[in-house]
């Protein structure tokens, strides 16, 4: 017996209801992976901009006298220092940012690989994707493809 959501109850074939939940779980998992990948890419882009800012400031400070006063934001407080004191700290920060960017890049590649494996495992196609390769696969192995239904994600 079907309820208002269109799922089949216990008296009917419960396999169809389980399949719908499974497809929803696959889509949710895929969207979660995509969101994680976007978050990594966003953080990497943000750090790239920060790295460029550090490079500009370092290049500018290298051209001025080491005893010249400069101001640095430390924990929300503007602190007066000399170029001689600030320059090594900025260079250290720049190196740390570069290491973090490299780590994020590796994580981004791993997440992309994980996402592609998930897509292949669950036969996920994105809307607007070229369907010619899928048609070619269907003509070669029609028997194998009919048993696993693909998931279309918008």
UniProtKB/Swiss-Prot annotation:
GO terms for biological process: negative regulation of amyloid fibril formation; positive regulation of cytoskeleton organization; protein folding. The keyword Nucleus applies. Residues 141-154 have a biased composition (Low complexity). Keywords: Chaperone, Cytoplasm, Mitochondrion, Nucleus. The keyword Mitochondrion applies. Pfam families: Prefoldin_2 (PF01920). One of its GO terms (molecular function) is unfolded protein binding. Its main location: nucleus. Residues 1-20, 126-154 are annotated as: Disordered. It is found in: Nucleus; Cytoplasm; Mitochondrion. Residues 9-18 have a biased composition (Gly residues). Residues 126-139 have a biased composition (Basic and acidic residues). GO terms for cellular component: cytoplasm; mitochondrion; nucleus; prefoldin complex; RPAP3/R2TP/prefoldin-like complex. Heterohexamer of two PFD-alpha type and four PFD-beta type subunits. Component of the PAQosome complex which is responsible for the biogenesis of several protein complexes and which consists of R2TP complex members RUVBL1, RUVBL2, RPAP3 and PIH1D1, URI complex members PFDN2, PFDN6, PDRG1, UXT and URI1 as well as ASDURF, POLR2E and DNAAF10/WDR92. Interacts with URI1; the interaction is phosphorylation-dependent and occurs in a growth-dependent manner. Binds specifically to cytosolic chaperonin (c-CPN) and transfers target proteins to it. Binds to nascent polypeptide chain and promotes folding in an environment in which there are many competing pathways for nonnative proteins. Belongs to the prefoldin subunit beta family. This is Prefoldin subunit 2. It comes from Rattus norvegicus.
